[in-house]
């Protein structure tokens, strides 16, 4: 539920940024632009949270630190990987402004949503299996 609201808020901000807001600050940004690729990375990070943290927590239900630190490390690595492509020649299109390369952006967003849904369902099922084995 919280992930859904966060993703909805991010989607609204991305659409607002892609359609209405246009400034030199956004055009000369060295980091990732607010576009559908960035939104797909948010879906991926939430999927990783569900897999690494939630899945790891329900293995023991009392060791919260290890899955949290593991998720933070994985999240940082994914963020670095997501920020890198638009600095690599030939991959600049993932950092498109506005509706430039919209088909690529939508395909990347669709991939992020599918990965999020699959990983979340698998993580949920695994967490339920682990939770049944835990003696609380």
Which residue ranges define each predicted feature?
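Hydrophobic alpha-helical transmembrane segments of membrane proteins
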Residues: 2-136
């Amino acid at each position: 539920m919280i992930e859904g609201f966060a993703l909805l808020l991010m989607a609204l901000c991305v659409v607002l940024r892609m359609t209405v807001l246009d400034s030199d600050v956004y055009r000369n940004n060295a980091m990732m632009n607010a576009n559908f690729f960035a939104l797909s990375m948010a879906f991926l990070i939430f999927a990783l949270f569900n897999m690494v943290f939630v899945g790891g927590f329900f293995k023991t239900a009392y060791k919260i630190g290890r899955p949290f630190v593991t998720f933070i490390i994985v999240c940082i690595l994914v963020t670095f990987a997501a920020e890198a492509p638009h600095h690599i020649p030939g991959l600049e299109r993932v950092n498109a402004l506005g509706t430039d390369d919209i088909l690529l952006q939508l395909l990347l967003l669709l991939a992020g949503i599918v990965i999020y849904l699959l990983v979340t369902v698998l993580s949920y099922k695994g967490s339920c299996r682990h939770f049944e084995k835990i003696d609380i």
